Each structure stands twice: as structure tokens, then as C-alpha cells.
Amino acid sequence: MDTLLNALSSDQEQMKAWRHHLHRHPELAFDEHGTARYIAELLRGWGYEVSEGIGRTGVVARMRCGDGTKSIGLRADTDALAVQEMSDSDHKSTVEGRSHTCGHDGHSAMLLGAARYLARTRAFNGTVNLIFQPAEEIMGGAVAMIEDGLFERFPMDAVFGMHNMPKLERGKLYFTAG
């Protein structure tokens, strides 16, 4: 794990820049059009096959490497909340009454960091699918993507999602089946 963290440390400032961009431009559930375009453009630039509009405003990016037959999914959420941000930070929301107060900007930035690392190193043998899910806050985005054929169009043996949890010990990963 230390080797991976060291490899990603050179991208730390870029990941912050992605997060700050997303934080300044929050979009509510099923209205993440600008977010989807931004993410898709980055992923295409790194060589991913990108599909937009999955489940209305979701993005799925796929990369194959080697001759492996396993296919995994890595998932992050993209929507913001209808909450006024009270921060004075330089990357404060520019949209009145909307903000990324639940951390989905961070989730997306972390998955973009993983995407760039995987594209650069191709450190896997099989297929990786990056799932940028809309509308997590209203609990409709996953269903919309599944009903839009997510798993038929992008077969996966396993999907890994994540959520940042500020109260958990820094530098630790916690897993649960689900």
C-alpha cells in the first residue's frame, strides 16, 4: 500500500485541483451535466473508452489491459446537495444554494486520481470500469444506471465503491460486503 501511496503522491496537487473545480461547480441529482463533461474529458485524455448519459447523467469509463478476463468496477458519486456553503475558502461553491457538503467532489477526485494512475501504469490485467454515479443523495442514481443496462453493457465481476469518513483513522481502509 505504501508503494501505491508514494506513486499517487506526485498527483496530490492535481487531485486537489480536480476536487476544487468540482467543489466550485456543484450540480444536484440528475443535473450533473457539467460535472459529467468535465470528468469524461479528463478520462478520454488518458485513453479510456468513455460512455456518457448512463442513468441520465452518469459516466462509465473502461480500459482493458493485458489478456486477463476479470472485470472490476470502481465507483464514485458526483451529485451535490441543495445546501448553501458558508465557507470562505478559495474553492467555495459558485452556485447559490448548492454545495458539495457530503464530499462527492472528493470521491470523484479520488477516482480520477486512480484513473490517471491506472492509465499511466496499466497496473492490472483485465478490464477496469470507472463508474461516476449521479444522484446518490436522492438514492436514485444507482437504480437509474442499472435500469439503463450498466451491468449488461459493462459486465463486472465485482464493484468497489467508497465513501470518505472523516471520523475514521487517517490512512486506513475499511471494508464491508454489500
Provide a role label for each language-model segment:
Residues D2-H100, A109-L112, R116-F124:
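Acidic/His- and Gly-rich active-site-bordering loop/insert found
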Residues V59-V60, L81-V83, S87-S99, D105-G106, ...:
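Histidine/acidic-residue-rich, glycine-tolerant segments that coordinate divalent metal ions
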